Amino acid sequence: MQTPTENTAENTVFELRQYTLYGGKRDTLISLFEKNFIETQDVVGAHVLGTFRDLDDPDRFVWLRGFRDMQTRPQALEAFYGHSPAWLAHKKEANATMVDSDNILLLRPASSPPQLQSSALNSSASPAIYGVTIYYLGDVDERQFADFFVHALLPRLNASGVHPIAVLTTDEEPNNFPRLPVREHDRVFLWMARWASEDDCAPFAAQMRTWSGWRDKAPEAVLPAVMRRPEQLRLKPTSRSPLQ
């Protein structure tokens, strides 16, 4: 079996999956997931890249999954959800923890491949924090927003010591595994970064809440996507998350 570390570089399709759970059930789901659903997905081509606790919502479990391409995605998902002994044995218990599991963004790289350096699976979580910032595009052209990001936002991030490890945008191909719904009508552009600890992340998070002038260079065609404050997630890796 390949490890998640070996599979990371081949992914061109991604899912950012946010599950809303019943109160007090997050650790139950994480325990099930880490014991049963990481290697068993990876072996069929559905690569679990990271599993996280949302620091700002105790009832939210977030994970990132990757696939080689859209052609292999339905095959991998059918192999896992239709035939994997691990899923068939534990799906009722897992589903019983969830209020909602349909908050899914189907994504592709906006430019260069993500630098998602997975670690060997172990049993201890690092103190790292991952931040995800999500801009909702509406009808804004993704290429125009990407140009604004590269020339206006990215230099400000870099000047603050932040270097995104992934920049992703909505994959607008139809969902080819309809048993698992995705948010097909929400077009987004997002970036992801890593901090060594919550203390390292906190100054930037505070700074970003009071950023002034970041919209100044936005062309008129991009304005609808920047008038809404972006959604921000602060994510702490679980103990066996490939991303640590």
Predicted regions and their residues:
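Surface-exposed interaction/gating patches
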Residues: 16-23, 28, 109-179, 183-198, ...
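Short, surface-exposed loop/turn motifs at beta-strand boundaries within globular domains
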Residues: 12-14, 56, 128
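An amphipathic, aromatic/His-enriched active-site/gating alpha helix that lines ligand/cofactor pockets
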Residues: 2-5, 9, 28-50, 56-57, ...
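Hydrophobic, helix-prone linear segments
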Residues: 1-15, 20, 25
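Short acidic/glycine-enriched loop/turn segments that link adjacent beta-strands
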Residues: 56-59, 174
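Short, solvent-exposed loop/turn elements at beta->coil junctions and helix N-caps
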Residues: 52-53, 170
